[in-house]
Amino acid sequence: ADGFIVPTAKSDYSWIDHDTIYLGTDFGPGSMTESSYPRTVRRLRRGESLSQATLVHEVSPSDLSVSGIHQHTPGFERDLIVEHLDFYRSRTLLFVDGQPVRLAVPDDADVSLRREWLIVHPRSDWTVGGVMRPAGSLLAIKLDGFLAGDRGFEELFRPDAHTALEDWDFTDSCLILTLLVDVASTLVVLDPSTGWSRSPLVGVPALSTVHVIDTDPDESDEFWLHATGFTTPSTVLRGVLGSVDLRVIRSSPPFFDASRFDVQQHWAASDDGTRVPYFQVAVRGLVLDGSHPTLLSGYGGFQASRLPEYSGIVGRAWLERGGVFVLANIRGGGEFGPGWHTAALKQNRPRAYEDFA
């Protein structure tokens, strides 16, 4: 009965404490951007009406939106504002002594704060501290030092022609990197207490698409994974770093006999010579003589990676009837990092279609 009631709108909120939230919603005329997202962040206490909420921050009407965030990690409680300039660019402000201070990183970089660390993932090449940090890398620095002017980042990941960073997730004591190596998932564990030493996460299914779906970063090193592949139904796994081996918790039922099919990866040359990978799924031992119906799928946009995933419909309605399924990882997606995405933007958009053809 004493909950927070917000009318239907494009809204955003973050808990500050049991009785207080940061709220972005339609507070009336002028409170939404031209994109119809929240233009203001306000502090609302339990029992207050929307008109009583205290203004914390506002952005230009031409910006996409704005969000307020409170981090609850014991000993590292902090408040942040994220100004979303558009789909790919944002600015992060940290409240220091009650005043918002913009973190001096590129607008197209992803930013996260974890305890004493500032983590930065630039999406374009960034020269900082006299060192060129490539697009798609992952950098770490002590937040206090950064605010004081230090720019001596530690490089946690550097992309190459075959490897891209898909995501990163903290547990209580470590950092798990989800990498794509030639469009197959590989997970690596970094330990900040030993200079970010790294080791592979053992037990991750091979040639699958694997994502971290949850961790407990303030309490334990427990982690949960979701794994899938062309012939592997969705599977949930659980482990605890250093104490409990990764094991399957539950899997979806299969919808076709996967033992009949082979999954292969091949590479094709696009018109400009760029090698473009694609997966092929077909009956084992199939003679590829051009006589078999083939379903070709691809996307190539918004830096979205098209990765191996299970489809009962494709398996039962197409593969079991003799069809061949092909998934193409064309440019415009994120399979090889930001550069793979930007290579098919604007005047270069035809490259995505050339890759697909």
Write out the residue ranges for each language-model feature.
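Beta-propeller folds
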Residues: 1-222, 226-234, 238-243, 258, ...
